Amino acid sequence: RSSDLGPLLRDFFAKVATDDLRFRFLSGVNSVSDDQIARMVDVDHKQTEDFLAFADGALVATGLVASDEARDRAEVAIVVRGDHKNRGIGWTLLGHIAEHARSLGIRFLESVEDRHNQAAIEVERDLGFSVKPYGDDPTLVVVSKQLCR
């Protein structure tokens, strides 16, 4: 139920390591604000969707995808709790999100990554994403994949 999602996400992000928060939000946040949580809960299910992954009844990963109005491009941001990394959860979640985006006719799926987030970049490469510099910012890369023509 959506009324349960706010507290669930708040508890999840309280268990996410500081480096993983930095990689997810591309900033030096130490915690996730109520406004950020609200944006993850109050999705429109048309241009934005938040996918949740559970293990043994606990939330262990979340993946937010947001598309432009034309559904030409969508951006995805995923975070997996540290104690559940290296189990294929991020890989599976990204694959599921890519299939969802493809089913909506979205042509390109992208993610902006911190250049040091090599684990995420490697997962994205494994799933056929290409990596390019992000504008003039040497600390970031854009990872993208064409889903349909």
What are these regions (language model features)?
Residues 20-28:
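A short, aromatic/hydrophobic, helix- or strand-capping loop or linear motif
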Residues 27-75, 81, 148:
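Acetyl-CoA-dependent GNAT
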Residues 80, 86-103, 118, 122-126:
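Conserved acetyl-CoA-binding loop-helix of GNAT-fold acetyltransferases
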Residues 100-113:
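Conserved GNAT acetyl-CoA-binding A-motif
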Residues 134-149:
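C-terminal "cap" of GNAT-fold acetyltransferases
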